[in-house]
Amino acid sequence: MHKLVSQLVVYRNLPADNLLEPLAAICARFAGGSYNREELTAEIYEQVHKLLDIGTVYGFDKNLWHNYLAFLLVSCENPFAITCEKVGACDGSVNQFAKHDFKIFQQLFAYDFSELERALEINCFSLISNYQAVVKQERRYNKNISDKVQALSTALEGAADADEFFACVTKFYHDYGVGKLGLNKAFRIAQAQQGEPELVPISNTEQITFDDLIGYEDQKQRLLENTEAFVAGRPANNVLLFGDSGTGKSSSIKALINKYYDQGLRMIEIYKHQFRDLSQVIAQIKNRNYRFIIYMDDLSFEEFEIEYKYLKAIIEGGLEVRPDNILIYATSNRRHLINETWKDRNDVTQEDGIYKSDTMQEKLSLVNRFGCTIYYGQPTQKEYYKIVCELAKKQGLELADDFLCAEARKWELHHGGISGRTAQQFINYLQGVADFSKK
């Protein structure tokens, strides 16, 4: 194995925490005969333990060795893979180097660990080649990655030669992408050791859809139309969803990533204390073959906060043009995002309804940079009852509408008033009581 791994060209720079190189070194020591049996066995178990951990995180099953090799291929962000991500497999000399590496990976897929197992009297490699994972709930592992990697692993197992192997891998790159941006829907920003911001995958995103959001049909339609245009490569606007709390603004944004992930949409969640990192984040993603929504939840600024100036410059106003593959979507309970004070109005005059205050104009200019503003208002009492009844049906609660409405009325009087969130909390309560009564 060590000889095979040492001959990789395109895939030579494997991730630092890869298992392939340590296993190759173990095989080299075994082949050379200069090893301590107990130490070598312990090292093998250490790598197998890591493989089992990876299998648990991603929900891998059956042949964990093949799954891991497939996972390694889709995780390596080398120039060849990133080019395939954008345009698919193109003619060029690099293809010959890639096929050379894929021939090696084919041999790794078929690698025979039996001699090693016999000599050390172990059977761990046999076990991981036919692994039966414990059934887990989807929220306990990244099902999105699991399904895609295992499908690729199965396809690569059936590849007759390096050309078929090449076709399978490059198709995956073009269809889904490569690395963490290709495999994950959503990200948050963390500060790396070097001080530069790092995109960290959010592995378990909420599986909400627009069908789960009752009402607000006009608002959802406007949001979908703008996002459809963006994903399709047509002109689209930055979006601000504003209005009363608990009305579904954040849920609408979350539903977008579930609807359009397969079409190349990715989402990056950012908080206002991270706005100064936006330029560096954009530099990391602007040349990738995805559409990015930079998402800001519950956005608002107090009088003393100046982070909004970073945001203004990024959205529109800086020297560098915002890339076509990036939009900013925000939610807020405030229409104008920034808290206004009477001091802001001291020098206000009004001509035909236009404020002349420089302070106010500076603050209001931020919201004007969102070309699409959508209002989510508090539902009426009738709409609230409709939301309650629809949610009850979706959850399988067989209760009369009159009873639901009467109880929902009592609930909202003590739980923050009428809203979609209040309705969902009420249904959660009813479902919990129903489940408890069955015990």
Q: Which residues fall in each region the model found?
A:
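Intrinsically disordered, low-complexity N-terminal extensions of AAA+/P-loop NTPases
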Residues: 1-157
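Walker A/P-loop nucleotide-binding motif
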Residues: 234-253
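N-terminal pre-Walker A segment at the start of P-loop NTPase domains
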Residues: 202-228
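Conserved catalytic/switch belt of AAA+ P-loop NTPases
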Residues: 302-352
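Conserved AAA+ ATPase "SRH/arginine-finger" region at the nucleotide-binding site
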Residues: 349-364, 371-385
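C-terminal alpha-helical "lid" subdomain
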Residues: 373, 377-439
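Interdomain "pre-motor" coupling segment immediately N-terminal to P-loop NTPase/helicase cores
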Residues: 135-199
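AAA+/P-loop NTPase substrate/partner-engagement loops
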Residues: 259-292, 299-304
